[in-house]
Amino acid sequence: MPTSISSFLSPSDVFLDVGEPDKISLLSDLARRAAPSVGLSSDVIVTELMKRERLGSTGMGGGVAIPHARYTGLKKPFGLVARLKPAVDFEAIDNMPVDLVFLLLVPAAAEGDHLNMLAAVSRRMRSREVTQKLRTLQDKTIFYKLLTAEPEKH
């Protein structure tokens, strides 16, 4: 059974038109936003995210990035999504700036969870139709519903 995005992303963790000048400022801002929900300090969150980014950018191309890391002491998987205005350089694989960022924080002990979460988010964000709509929506509720909608079975 594939992981659903709504199992780790709540409507209150959708942020539209976040403005940060660069990747490090952006990750720090997202860590500050996530910290109260997960019971970790923003410093701990950003340190692990930066360690992961040093292994290779989590910018997957097409203006989308999925920064993620695993944390000891985290009780359950957590997601946060931000649409950026303006887009920032994320050293993505296609060298295009990023304007849709999906932050994933995963418990260290949850072996397969983070791969399932990454797969769920990448499948959804790979749809050009979905990402184009996410770039234009002004209502957080509709943004959340589009992001968490289960793809139709054919």
What are these regions (language model features)?
Residues 1-154:
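Cytosolic covalent-transfer regions centered on His/Cys nucleophiles
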